[in-house]
A protein has these predicted regions:
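Conserved beta-hairpin
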Residues: 50-67
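Conserved GNAT acetyl-CoA-binding A-motif
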Residues: 117-129
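Conserved beta-strand-loop-alpha-helix junction that forms the acyl-donor binding cleft
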Residues: 101, 127-137, 155
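Conserved active-site alpha-helix within GNAT-family acetyltransferase domains
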Residues: 131-149
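A short beta-loop-alpha structural element at the N-terminal edge
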Residues: 2-16
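Conserved acyl-donor/pantetheine-binding loop and adjacent beta-alpha core of acyl/acetyltransferases
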Residues: 67-101
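Conserved acetyl-CoA-binding loop-helix of GNAT-fold acetyltransferases
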Residues: 103-115, 138-142
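Conserved GNAT-fold acetyl-CoA-binding loop/helix
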Residues: 22-42
Length: 166
């Protein structure tokens, strides 16, 4: 598996991947996180246009997972019910989704984020997830992230927030 920047040619595959992820979440006790059809096609296209959407592809360059990686400070992380280990610059992983074809997806994403962080001289990676997203919470903990507290999205929805200090 390889990770590359998504392009407009990947939009149909991205729609398929996010639909599969919504089904998986609903079937695993998390029907509300993306239950409203988010991220929308327009949100996905915008992330692709920004160059922040990445895809994991197989040997035929077919995307099977997607995520976004940002180097700018996330405004929703400015206030936390808890505490971040530090206030140093960080990368943020968002919108992790998979069609469940490939295995080791989150480990590959974290390895990729670590490489990007090292290249940018950034010493932390942050991620958040819904309280009902137990599979993701397990993967986050397994990858070595520390639970830091609760943040709130722009719409007020709470998310469990984690940081990996590199």
């Amino acid at each position: 598996m390889q990770i590359r920047t998504a392009t407009a040619a990947d939009l149909n595959d991205l729609a398929r991947i996010y639909a599969a992820a919504r089904r998986f979440m609903a079937e695993n006790g998390n029907p509300t996180q993306w239950g409203d059809g988010r991220p929308t096609a327009a949100e996905i296209a915008e992330t692709v246009e920004q160059g922040a959407c990445l895809v994991g592809v197989d040997e035929h360059d077919v995307p099977h997972f997607a995520f976004s990686l940002y180097s700018e400070a996330d405004p929703t992380y400015a206030t936390i019910e808890g505490a971040w280990p530090n206030d140093a610059p960080y990368l943020t992983i968002h919108r992790v989704a998979s069609d469940s074809v490939l295995h080791g997806v989150f480990a590959a994403i974290v390895a990729f984020a670590r490489e990007r962080a090292a290249a940018a001289d950034v010493a932390s990676v942050r991620v958040d997830t819904h309280e009902d997203n137990k599979p993701m919470q397990h993967l986050i903990a397994k990858a070595g992230f520390a639970y830091c507290g609760v943040i709130h999205l722009a719409d007020g929805d709470p998310r469990l927030a984690y940081q990996l200090v590199l």
